[in-house]
Amino acid sequence: MGEENQPNYTISQENWSLHRKGYDDQQRHQEKVQEAIKNNLPDLVTEESIVMSNGKDVVKIPIRSLDEYKIRYNYDKNKHVGQGNGDSKVGDVVARDGSGGQKQKGPGKGQGAGDAAGEDYYEAEVSILELEQAFFKELELPNLKRKEMDENRIEHVEFNDIRKTGLWGNIDKKRTMISAYKRNAMRGKASFHPIHQEDLKFRTWNEVLKPDSKAVVLAMMDTSGSMGIWEKYMARSFFFWMTRFLRTKYETVDIEFIAHHTEAKVVPEEEFFSKGESGGTICSSVYKKALELIDNKYSPDRYNIYPFHFSDGDNLTSDNARCVKLVEELMKKCNMFGYGEVNQYNRHSTLMSAYKNIKDENFRYYILKQKADVFHAMKSFFREESGEKMA
């Protein structure tokens, strides 16, 4: 074979699966991180360091380390064919210790000193963005409707086209190789080499204009003297995540913050999350303020309206009937009304007793008794609807 006919490439015959070990380990690590986020999410969402942060911090969560393959001494000295029932996963501990059937103290968890090895854990840093992705993926504004007077449009970029020219960073390797295989196969060559210019395929984006309805969320919080430090923290934790959820998933959602004791007033967001007040409780005042806002600023013909009220349920008894009437009036103009009650010790609530008589399906309530209930309240209020979504 002449020098000019010598191939300018070689094909390696080594085991390429060995080169993927680092990638496989990285994938296993990411799976463990996502599993840890999912398992710890109800507790993580109420971490004070997150709720009181600027939204850019990271948190640390414990993750079980993966056991690498190792040779262990066979204490039982028995012959074995295999292990397990087929449910084992990479990294699971499969060896037995040399107890000889005797009872052991265990790995040192709880009281007393154990004598067995424990599970290795390490702390992984997780950004709030990763928490949001895990938390918000199954949440949506319920009963979102198209409004007749709505003319909003959202520009959305979608990679939905394949072209023969484009940026090298957007080259579609799979389609390029398939194209080369087809061309070479027609010439009797069972390979994708060489790749010609005509084989190149590039992913290309198009700008898509999607109609989008306006929505407004009325965040109403009881700041009276009966709302202690823990109650206010729970309410603010809910509204913290609600605000981030709305601003992450929806581009045209307004949020109005209303604080109340015996009187209600619209306050800036920073004051809503930081300022404490005292005094008695007349919840009807905040519903009147909400109706006033709707009448003056947010017409139901143009806006999807979602009021959310958080309180400890300790309302002036004579005001409860008025509250029920105003809530029913609000629901005629709103897509959904959400009431969250922070009631750690399961005490009698005059307000909840009145609200339980409301039978409207668009009225949702949730009683929060522990920190993890902030997560469950979000899932309850913003759960995905089984019916048709807004077109």
Curated annotation (Swiss-Prot):
InterPro entries: Spore_YhbH, UPF0229. Residues 1-16 have a biased composition (Polar residues). It comes from the Bacteria. Residues 98-115 have a biased composition (Gly residues). Residues 21-31 have a biased composition (Basic and acidic residues). Residues 1-31, 80-117 are annotated as: Disordered. Belongs to the UPF0229 family. This is UPF0229 protein BA_0551/GBAA_0551/BAS0519. It comes from Bacillus anthracis.
